[in-house]
UniProtKB/Swiss-Prot annotation:
Pfam families: RNA_pol_Rpb2_1, RNA_pol_Rpb2_2, RNA_pol_Rpb2_3, RNA_pol_Rpb2_6, RNA_pol_Rpb2_7. GO terms for cellular component: chloroplast; DNA-directed RNA polymerase complex; mitochondrion. Its main location: plastid. It is found in: Plastid, Chloroplast. This is DNA-directed RNA polymerase subunit beta. One of its GO terms (biological process) is DNA-templated transcription. InterPro entries: DNA-dir_RNA_pol_bsu_ext_1_sf (IPR042107), DNA-dir_RNA_pol_su2 (IPR015712), DNA-dir_RNAP_su2_dom (IPR007120), DNA-dir_RNAP_su2_hyb_sf (IPR037033), RNA_pol_bsu_bac (IPR010243), RNA_pol_bsu_CS (IPR007121), RNA_pol_bsu_protrusion (IPR007644), RNA_pol_Rpb2_2 (IPR007642). One of its GO terms (molecular function) is DNA binding. DNA-dependent RNA polymerase catalyzes the transcription of DNA into RNA using the four ribonucleoside triphosphates as substrates.
Amino acid sequence: MPRDGNEGMFTIPGFSQIQFEGFCRFIDQGLMEEFHKFPKIEDTDQEIEFQLFVERYQLVEPLIKERDAVYESLTYSSELYVPAGLIWKTGRDMQEQTIFIGNIPLMNSLGTFIVNGIYRIVINQILQSPGIYYRSELDHNGISVYTSTIISDWGGRSELEIDRKSRIWARVSRKQKISILVLSSAMGSNLREILDNVCYPEIFLSFLNDREKKKIGSKENAILEFYQQFACVGGDPVFSESLCKELQKKFFQQRCELGRIGRRNMNRRLNLDIPQSNTFLLPRDVLAAADHLIGMKFGMGTLDDMNHLKNKRIRSVADLLQDQFGLALVRLENAVRGTICGAIRHKLILTPQNLVSSTSLTTTYESFFGLHPLSQVLDRTNPLTQIVHGRKLSYLGPGGLTGRTASFRIRDIHPSHYGRICPIDTSEGINVGLIGSLAIHARIGHWGSIESPFYEVYQRSKETKMVFLSPSRDEYYTVATGNSLALNRGGIQEEQIVPARYRQEFLTIAWEQIHLRSIFPFQYFSIGASLIPFIEHNDANRALMSSNMQRQAVPLSRSEKCIVGTGLERQAALDSGVSAIAECEGKIIYTDTHKIVLSGHGDTISIPLVMYQRSNKNTCMHQNPQVRRGKCIKKGQILADGAATVGGELALGKNVLVAYMPWEGYNFEDAVLISERLVYEDIYTSFHIRKYEIQTHVTSQGPERITHEIPHLEAHLLRNLDRNGIVALGSWVETGDILVGKLTPQTANESSYAPEDRLLRAILGIQVSTAKETCLKLPIGGRGRVIDVRWIQKKGGSSYNPETIRVYISQKREIKVGDKVAGRHGNKGIISKILSRQDMPYLQDGTPVDMVFNPLGVPSRMNVGQIFECSLGLAGDLLDRHYRIAPFDERYEQEASRKLVFSELYEASKQTANPWVFEPEYPGKSRIFDGRTGDPFEQPVLIGKSYILKLIHQVDDKIHGRSSGHYALVTQQPLRGRAKQGGQRVGEMEVWALEGFGVAHILQEMLTYKSDHIRARQEVLGTTIIGGTIPTPEDAPESFRLLVRELRSLALELNHFLVSEKNFQINRKEA
């Protein structure tokens, strides 16, 4: 973290810095580490040798720009070239060529990757750190059993356990365990070396009988015994080299390779001094672990907390990319070996160029970014979402946990998370606690641990020094939870007793015993939680919901920054990359909606702007210039605001006038009543861009054609097509309109020919071919304005590279009934009614309220922060002020938040000469009037300005109706889901509700006639259209017939009888 020039000052690190540092570590170190593992490859006769001169590898600058990669659906990558040599040992001749290994995707300026035109991001993963861990469990007799677990770098586990007779066993599988002596002997130690390297040799000798002596008499016997137990092999196996190789591959490589981090942890836990370069498990490690285990049984040593962050490591983007690069080099090695053997067998001429194929590296990275669970499509709903996505930490993924097997203890908050992992920001549902978010000041250290910054405390000095502590060092210091605001000018704490943290406990101790102190009030939280004002007054569950819902906010057409904020809005907007920033000082010489031209230092720089770009959530990303021609600017100044930013600050919602009161039941159960002003003045209007695409292929009957001449369709549907058969820019299209006209050739049957076609074929022998229309049609709910059309042609032009046509349609969506809105305190609701302005409640100065919330939603949810924000926002609106509030201000003064709000309301009341703004009898509340009658309400009502967001959950994307459509083949019931034009499910609770009203006939229709009765549903549809009595069928519905068939498959015959309503005769019907 860079230090500022002023004493005691600090700067917040870039929120995308973790991604950048990880990728740079992969380029600077990871590539060379994997390259050095690439061996020299020889043929079977050892006459030809192939090797890579990895010190001279080159990464070429990308051939395309980021925007072009997105536009053309390409991968933003760099080509990797390595000099390679082919040596003929007989003639001592060498041929050297620079060969192309493959493409490595590059990280862009947002900290993401562009793969096939899609923004993707790699999530950091939390894994159990390799090393050794001791724990204690109770057996069925209630006696403590001590075990140690050795975790390898590959994730494999081996256990040592001590029984009641103080015998030590190594458990190599769930069922099999072997003596520690056999394991040590199989690893290369004899009995004398074992006894010399342990602290309790008498315990090892206590269970050394004749049988054990025979097992460890030689290394070969020990290996055979170990293999027999490990592989569960019966009989008497014979020692051989293949047996050793199999044991080496299945056990020692997967369970004994500690890696760099594991070796460090093993040395620190067992007080060893084995060199860091020795990354494999040694007999000395096993014996030291056994000694420590014996000490545990005798009450010496401490057990390990597996959930402590010192026992976790972060698997960052550098580690994941390095693993994939190593996998690609292994595949390349196998391919080169096979090519050399094949070339020698067929006596072909060998060169380094024809030995190496670039497909190994390229396909490895393509499959990684496309299929790996930790490689995800970047969520770009708004600028905040982009940053937060890159700072996620996941326990899930390969080598990690699963949502169904993770225990509650793993999901819970741990004291070591303090200042490193946010205790609030996590996902909801089955993955709660398994997907977290980094705290804003946390960074990933060299050893894969999460480090947090603190200030050292000097009792008699003003000097401040910042240190980064890993979780393992954290326990040795007392850390004051106060920050720099709690210190006076002399640097000495005014209060003698301060709250502090020591060894995972929160205490109150004297200031003289403090070693470190926190640096920032938001140090413990993630970015999402740090944007919530008055977060200390909210329940943690509601703060969690708010952190998640801010990421779902839709960028509005006219953004507005919040009156009450936290101060991190500018940093979040800056690091998101949605704003255009001046890279150097200069003068603006030209500006329009497409670009800004800047002249500085003798050069002219053209800065392109983002114009109506679609995100993967269909939101609109757009940049608006904020500078005029002729204006002089400085480096770092905002040139253009992006989506959901104003003046370089994050602006996700709108400041609207709200009231907390019931209104005719329209805000029952979190429903929200809004004014029509929000619709007519486009307060909550947003733009959404949808993408529709179609491809042309070469079929067996010929190539498909893009044309505007479609004989099968009406001219009205083709009205928007140009002469090429593609919809024209700026056209307004409705559901069912043709966006791209396409004909697919096909050969018709003889019977389908028209008479004149058969005559032509008989007389002239002309083969008549017909074409089927396969046009791109606008689906339901897609109406809007065409803003862009892209015709992408792949290079090469073969039939395997089809042409792609993409049409982008923009929709303008006002707020409407059914949309979801939310505040920043977890207060969410659905729009229930849009009321005219004259009917809305109004203030004493005649201003109508914009939104009406239910007051019962506050006390039970315990998110009181919205009350503080509401009242302070009203004062800020009247005084034309903006507030940036730090959390936990009550630590400096009792009731600090309340005093601030009331003082600002009182000042606003004085300056505006409106006594109703602050009334001492009920401060914060006011008498308001019913817009329908003009009478005042009985009780004073809380009114104020709140920052309300419009979320991505909109009614236009969810509402759906069906009159008829497709049915499932087996059950003959309607399909499920909006995408399939499915029906509405009548579930168990819906049936109960209908039963409660006694509507037997409606219930029968919904469950039988309209659903899965094949003949009756056709009659019901026709009767509903023309009117009349709905017919009552006399046979069973299809679901009942399906049940009968399934019972018959179980050899059960079910006879059923239907009673006729006409004559009450029993008629037997076959199913």
